[in-house]
């Protein structure tokens, strides 16, 4: 079975352009709803060579804001990447979850995804 970090990457790869998910949502999909911080660590641990394959910018905090704390990427960079995909931020830097929130994966979809890895 893939490591938790690898499972995070597989789930994040399923988030389509123009949609966002929260760290907690990704953790909950993986059956670990209290592991939001670990999802953040997984994304912060991406090597530059893997960043093109994992759309890390599509994961934001549960309030609908960018909350990156990574020396390689600034918050403005993550917001710019999302805006280029059509995600809109209000004047205070919030995303409307109803418009841009990802519906996630069903347990059946997750099982199939992990079985293929």
Tell what function each PLM region has:
Residues 1-117:
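Nucleic acid-binding interface residues in structured DNA/RNA-binding domains
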């Amino acid at each position: 079975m893939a490591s938790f970090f690898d499972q995070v990457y597989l789930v994040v790869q399923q988030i389509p352009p123009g949609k966002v998910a929260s760290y907690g949502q990704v953790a909950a999909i993986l059956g670990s709803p209290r592991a939001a911080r670990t999802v953040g660590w997984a994304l912060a641990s991406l090597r530059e060579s893997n960043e093109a394959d994992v759309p890390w910018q599509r994961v934001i905090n549960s309030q609908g804001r960018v909350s990156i704390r990574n020396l390689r990427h600034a918050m403005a960079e993550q917001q710019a990447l999302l805006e280029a995909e059509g995600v809109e931020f209000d004047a205070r830097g919030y995303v409307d979850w109803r418009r841009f929130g990802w519906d996630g994966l069903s347990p059946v979809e997750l099982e199939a995804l992990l079985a293929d890895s």
